[in-house]
From Swiss-Prot:
Name under which the protein is recorded: Ribosomal RNA large subunit methyltransferase Cfr
Function: Specifically methylates position 8 of adenine 2503 in 23S rRNA. Confers resistance to some classes of antibiotics.
Classification of source organism: Bacteria, Bacillati, Bacillota, Clostridia, Eubacteriales
Binding annotation for S-adenosyl-L-methionine: G157, E158, S188, S211, L212, H213, N292
Entry note: cofactor: Binds 1 [4Fe-4S] cluster. The cluster is coordinated with 3 cysteines and an exchangeable S-adenosyl-L-methionine.
Amino acid sequence: MKQTKTKYGKMKQMVSNLKLPDYRYEQLTKAIFHQRIDNFDDIHILPKALRMSLVNEFGKNVSSVIPVFSQDSKQAQKLLFELTDGERIEAVGLKYKQGWESFCISSQCGCGFGCRFCATGSAGFKRNLTADEITDQLLYFYFNNHRLNSISFMGMGEAFANPELFDAVKILTDQNLFGLSQRRITISTIGIIPGIQRLTKKFPQVNLAFSLHSPFESRRSDLMPINKRFPLNEVMKTLDEHIIHTGRRVFIAYIMLEGINDSKEHAEAVVGLLKNRGSWEHLYHIDLIPYNSTDKTTFKFQSSSAIKQFCSTLKKAGISATVRTQFGSEISAACGQLCYENEL
């Protein structure tokens, strides 16, 4: 990665170009990440010439994303952000009873993969986000006194389809910037094999979540067209390699769709998919997700009793499985519901 690709690289280069000592960059990053100062002009410890250069290059504020709409529920907040070119994305903040805060961020404007159960795909793909636009979503929450306890790339878009993803993760894990542990970050994928392989090599401690949704190749291809490009069998082999290399658990997301993928046959096929893979198979964990309805899709919500029965079948076969506790569905902030349709 070139040093000047992200704004933090540009800031460092700016300090050098102005022939200022290196500690000025350290003062700048400490003002942002320790003192939570979002306005360059308010970083009074910096020389005026540097502050003026920062404003000229990046604008008045450190964060480039502008909140234009917010919806709150008891434990969730959904933000609609406008970017500098007018495009819009959504991000979600979640609060748990223990005080833990988790954030679901977007990696793309829209999504071009067309998963049939996901509202984001109905909008189509607009463009990839830059590494700064990805991390600025979190910077906004941070500047508003939230604690960045955990981060998930489960918002709009397929993270591994965006080349900027790994620059964003580098920013998030840089101890002089966000300083997050890799283990506090989760990347969700529909099964982009090259992306999984790159994550294994570059950030082996980052959590990986794979969207399965059907154990049958043909049915999965119908629900998720990406399966024709990266077949389930090949993805599973790549996930095996990831576990062997990292020793880390892989989470497998499975949205429960009534009459589509919720039968005993499906549950037994999931068992067959995960059993007898090797000594590492215990590191696969199934995350059953109740379907969240939207006006963009036509699937039906599965009853909680049916989901529990599906989960029971998995557990009896020795598969690690849980039913996800969902927050934010009442404000269209849950899994599969983000579609940036709200406006002031």
